[in-house]
Amino acid sequence: MSIVTIPARNEKSPFASMKGHHVAVRVPDFAAAKRWYVEKLDFRVVHEWPYADQRLAYLAPAADDSFFIEILGDGQPGPIPKPGYQDLGDSLRLAGFHHFCLNVADMDRTIAELRRRDVAIVTEPFELPVIGRRLAFVADPWGNLIELAQVLA
């Protein structure tokens, strides 16, 4: 159970219809990124389309239809490479987008399977009691960080 208290919803806000939809991830190689997210994380390809000299796709987690990753790949100039992180502390010093988070039911099982699939584990699982979560961080081959979060019992 989460210890984070969510304030009451503001249904009267002019922005009440806003809901999260996707996070865009820029990669240099569209086909390789799509393949990585499908093969390593079991994401499903929802839709693909071209835009100028780039290729884009919405990818959804294996059993979640409410959150997408939008892959933006190819095109010129290519994206500026992200640095390789040795640990989470290194990454927290950079401005801008940091990571996206995926909830998991069993952190140990998830990390074991990611390790079996040769996914880079950036930070081993650790507990953060102040938010009632057990967290870990992994990275795709292009340095995009993915947080994994399990609610502490």
Identify the meaning behind each predicted range.
Residues 2-4, 27-32, 80-145:
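Vicinal oxygen chelate
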Residues 19, 55, 65-67, 93-98, ...:
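Residues that flank catalytic or metal-binding motifs in active/ligand-binding sites
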Residues 72-77, 150-153:
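Acetyl-CoA-dependent GNAT
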Residues 59-64, 138-141, 151:
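Active-site beta-strand termini and strand-to-loop segments that position acidic
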Residues 24, 44-51, 123-129, 150-153:
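Conserved catalytic-core motifs of GNAT/GCN5-like acyltransferases
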Residues 68, 145-148:
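Short glycine-/small-residue motifs
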Residues 2-32, 52, 97-104, 150-153:
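N-terminal beta-strand motif that seeds the catalytic metal site of vicinal oxygen chelate
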Residues 15-17, 25-70, 74, 116:
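Core segments of cupin and vicinal oxygen chelate
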